[in-house]
């Protein structure tokens, strides 16, 4: 899971073990953080628009299974799934 929100959003609550790469840095940092392009990569933001942009960049970079967490962190929290604060 790759969280593409800004640092303050990520710190306020994120999915356990999610990697943090702000959307503006995704093209540069994704290949450093997720080296295996065959594995699924799930992008998350607040509601999905930034994740969708990250998914498009990942496809351009050759990732085979980039996905978007539908509804983003709002949907995750609304489903009472665990959130970690840092």
Residue ranges and their predicted role:
Residues 7-42, 46-86:
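Rhodanese-like catalytic fold shared by cysteine-dependent sulfurtransferases
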Residues 1-3:
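Structural scaffold elements adjacent to functional motifs in cytosolic proteins
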């Amino acid at each position: 899971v790759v969280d593409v929100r800004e640092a303050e959003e990520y710190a306020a609550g994120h999915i356990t073990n999610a990697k943090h790469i702000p959307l503006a840095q995704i093209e540069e940092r994704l290949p450093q953080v997720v080296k295996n392009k065959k594995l699924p990569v799930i992008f998350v933001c607040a509601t999905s628009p930034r994740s969708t942009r990250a998914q498009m960049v990942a496809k351009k970079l050759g990732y085979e299974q980039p996905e978007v967490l539908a509804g983003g962190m709002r949907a995750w929290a609304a489903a009472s799934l665990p959130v970690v604060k840092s």
